[in-house]
Structure formats: structure tokens, C-alpha cells
């Protein structure tokens, strides 16, 4: 797959016609290559090449806050996007506050989805050798909670406040590094615990097991069922998620703590996004390549990809519509419907 990874070159070619698909070069940005969005975008590059649709040059290890803005501005053709980001952009809040409301709304309107998936489920974990005994152990601790800016950091701060009432800088010390340094930071003692996006099984967790056994804590059921968490679940790109511990994919070295046999947490949903001005036929062909490659490309890439909700169009899992400003690209809609899927009118 390395042949699909290269430094982004200038000149997004999203406006080229489908008649020259075999010659199209597209650029894409995504998160770390071992994450769900990282593997998903790399899988798209493979599926598109297999179908002779396009050559997609992928730059992994990016902060997706920047990547989504690059797509909106036409600087990049494709990006992995947690759906909270276009929402924050549309309101010019959080990492997009400097854009201003008018500019933020304008940029957010330039982004459309090809397909969706569950990026991760946010949770707390720590080495068994640490002094962390669960969510109540966060007070006064150093918590690695994501890159310096982006959806992961925003969600982690929100989740910690929901569980403990603590804010970064007052109740605990936040540690932020880019995704490329994540495993090193988990292993080197820079933080006491980690509130990060997880897949099941999670690549960062399994890689860090070389430094010792770990424990993952579910959200307490009382918090998961609370009105406060229900409000979190209404944020665009957030889907309350329950998963049987037995289905999380861990064997030795990892203990999952819950009141029952179920892990609970906020699922982060997003998808691959493009500029709304991408050529209809190109967007359609890319989406068709995705659909055709679901089993032999996407779900075959990593153990956790089979439960990441690729190929779903039910808004209960995609979190399209409602407060989510993102719609499917018209070309993507055509590909989905030709493949026999139903796309809700509110997502078109």
C-alpha cells in the first residue's frame, strides 16, 4: 500500500471529467495510517486504482481540522472528516473561531460526503502500573488527549468534563502531540492516562502493550444514560455506542472495566469528504469503487475495519441530517442508489 502514499503535490484535479478517469490524479489527507480514517482513505486509494478511476496521492498523519478546511478551500481533493468539524466550521467556533461566522459558514457549505463510517469510540485507558483507577483518578493527572487541535481534543475535553466536571488546566494537565508521536507518548511516561479515540482492537493500545498491561474504562452506565450525555449524543458526528466487551478484539494484556459485559462511550462518526464542486462523474466513480471494494479492500485491511460501519446509510449510524451540515455529493448519491441503497432526502 505504500505506493499510494506520497507527499501532496500542487494542483487539485477534482474538476476533470470522468472520460479521463484513468489519468486523474487526486490528493487526499488523513490521520495516522493505522487509524480507522487513515486506513479508510488508503483503502479508497487502492479501490480507486483497482477500478481504474484515479491515482490518489495520500498524505497521512495530518490534523483533520486542517484537512477539512483544505478541502473546503479547494486545496485538497479528499479528506477524512469527523462530522463535528464541518459543524464547528459552520459556526466558526472551537478550532475555527478565527474564520469568523460568515467565512466559516461559506467554507462549510463547500464540503460534501462520499460515504461515512465510525471513526472511533472515545474512552479512558492507562497502564496498570499507573496510579489511575478510573475516571475519578483523572484529577491532578497528566492526560494525553489528542493533537494540539482537532476533533479528538475537543471530544476528549468534553468527555472528561462530563464524567468528572474537571476542565483542562484547572483539574488536570492536558498533554497534546501530533498523531505520529502518539504511541511514543503513551509509552514514554509523558502522561498518566489517555483519553483518546479507540478502534476495537485499537492499534495504539496493542502497540503500547510492549511497555506493560493496560486497563480501559467504559463510561459508567449512569453517565451513559444521563440527560447530559444525551445532549452530547446530539452533537453532529456523535453516536452513543455500546459494544460487548467480548467483541472488542482484545486477548491478553488488556482489561476492560464496566459494570456489566458492555463497553459504552461516544462514537465519533465521519466520512470521506470532497469539495461540492468535484465533478459529478468523478465523485460517482469514487463512491462506486468504495462500494465495490467494501469486502475485499476495506474490511480486509485491519481487524477493526469490519465493525467500523463502512457501507451504512441508516442515519442512526451515519449521523447525517439533523444538526450535521454535511450532505452527500450528488455523484455519491447516484452511486449509492444505483447500488441499491436508500439515501434519505435530508442527506441529499
Residue ranges of predicted features:
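Gram-negative bacterial Sec-dependent N-terminal signal peptides
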Residues: 1-21
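Extracytoplasmic
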Residues: 23, 53, 63-66, 73, ...
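Bilobed "Venus flytrap"/periplasmic-binding protein-like clamshell domains
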Residues: 23-57, 120-188, 199-202, 326-331
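An extracytoplasmic/periplasmic, membrane-proximal ligand-sensing/linker region
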Residues: 40, 198-212, 216-224, 228-231, ...
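Sec-exported extracytoplasmic/periplasmic mature domains
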Residues: 46-53, 72-76, 91, 129, ...
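N-terminal segment of the mature folded domain
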Residues: 72-116
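Pocket-lining segment of extracytoplasmic ligand-binding domains
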Residues: 83-85, 92-94, 100-103, 130, ...
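Ligand-binding clefts/hinges and TM-proximal coupling segments of bilobed small-molecule sensing domains
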Residues: 139-145, 149-158, 236-285, 289-312
